[in-house]
């Protein structure tokens, strides 16, 4: 990895899971909540045009999974009820596999939105996150988020934290609609969308493959490990354990 040149950084691009937000919150709160609510949500909103479109996207994804021999549960179209049941069973299968496919993430985002709005869910971030956001804003850094969760889910998470609504600090949200997080082209698209050169970005994530993809696109990157006793992975470059280490006062 090339040495980090903080003087060039104008945009701080952040991962969520394991970086701004505890992994346990994602896997022990958000995912189980979506799984529990999936059937009732789909049945209640199946006739909504947006949800109907997501169900159709799931059907197309199902065909792709079959072609790739991933052995998803069967999808039948014998009747509206059978189609609905197929979409629910397939959705549960995708959740169990921690799939990052866009229609599932959008559907999860809709379910989580209801949970956040009802107060059943509240966003979680590490304690250093709101402090860092305020510090970076003082230093005139642009803060953006890139997560596999839908943009809607990202916004709801940061809007409902114990520290209050943090979305005013965030200029842009990106999800897998821009591309897979382990592919360099995704980071190139993000840079182009903000009309910035890649070296103006500092990407922070807990995933080595994502770090490598960002670096391949020309971005600067830091591996974030919230475990203070973890060793840096080979080739990961610089590693931090807290946002206090990024543009600290």
Where in the sequence are the language-model features?
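Conserved phosphoryl-transfer catalytic core
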Residues: 26-92
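Short catalytic/ligand-binding loop motif for oxyanion handling, primarily in non-cytosolic enzymes
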Residues: 20-24, 152-155, 212, 230-232
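Asp-based, Mg2+/Mn2+-dependent phosphohydrolase catalytic module
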Residues: 1-8, 168-249
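Substrate-recognition element of Asp-dependent hydrolases with the DxDx(T/V) motif
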Residues: 109-110, 118-161
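Asp-based phosphoryl-transfer active-site loop
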Residues: 5-26
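Short, well-ordered beta-to-alpha junction loops that form the rim of enzyme active sites
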Residues: 16, 146-150, 206
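Metal-dependent phosphoesterase signature
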Residues: 65-127
